[in-house]
Amino acid sequence: IKDKLLKAMNENDGFLQEIDFKKYKINSGAPLVSSYRNNLVFTAGPPSGGGVVLLTSLNILSAYDLSKYGSNSTATYHLIAEALRRGHNNRSHHIGDPSFYDIPINDLLSKERTKEFIKSISFDKATPSSKVRPLRITNESRDTTHYSIVDKDGNAVSNTY
């Protein structure tokens, strides 16, 4: 895989070199774990932000009996959109590389935060993203690169920088 990446970099004026692969150290962390309707949900923790979006959204949705609204109803889609909006708020304002940032993961996924989010959802209208309150204000760089590779033997690597 490394040789193919380096070949592609060389052919396309890329910036990765052999030394970058030699210096690279793999970081792995514990997964985030939560429950949703009596099912355990395991997902990637920071620096990946998707897990926080997923668990925040599921924590919010667990407060609603979605079957009451029907699987294809406006109310169900509205709740899913509102939950995802709040999940993305948690990700956008608070997730980064834990090697460099203090990430308040327990606060982000807490019952108290979930209750605040649930109280802020209206069935009458969509919440403007600007009105979803971050836990605290942080500045996020706009420079992120991510790639995941799986080879024919099932070996996998995921990299975000």
Range-by-range predicted roles:
Residues 14, 63-161:
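Internal maturation/activation junctions in enzymes
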Residues 56-63:
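Short glycine/serine- and small hydrophobic-enriched flexible loop segments
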Residues 49-56, 86:
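Extended, domain-scale alpha-helical bundle/helix-rich regions
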Residues 1-46, 122-129, 133-139, 147-155:
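Accessory "access/gating" subregions that flank catalytic or transport cores
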Residues 44-52, 74, 144:
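Short, conserved micro-motifs enriched in small and acidic residues
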Residues 7, 20-22, 56, 70-73, ...:
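Composition- and surface-driven signal marking solvent-exposed, interaction-prone regions
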